[in-house]
């Protein structure tokens, strides 16, 4: 797992601004994310900050990872138990929980397991939404499929 900050700070600011707009529906936020990153494989999502259960995931999750969308929103630990690669699981969950507990936006790179068994590398950018009591209440994020970039880096190409 990699926890480096985005190299394009402007991109991160645009994404966080888009996700911080409470009046927008997640479908609108999803459309904005796709407009900001044309041609990129990405998943827009929203979930509970305390349980990490997803309440929304964009249709692209099915294309990128192959799981039915319903699993994301009906299985409380789906992301942690199924999506995150077993070798990255404890570190990814701990990092996300620590940053969320501190009410800090964060981003991290981890391996995921697709429904067909493929390994997919995801760069997850997370916006922490603070509730009325000053604690994290919601998480909104975007998962970018960076598998090709990681493979190019590993082989020395690019």
Where do the PLM segments sit?
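General secondary-structure edge motif
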Residues: 17, 24, 41-42, 52, ...
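Surface-exposed charge patches
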Residues: 35, 60, 115
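PAS-family sensory domains
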Residues: 14, 51-66, 68-140, 150
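Short, contiguous, well-ordered secondary-structure segments
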Residues: 38, 44-45, 57-65, 110
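PAS-family sensory modules
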Residues: 1-50, 76, 130, 137-158
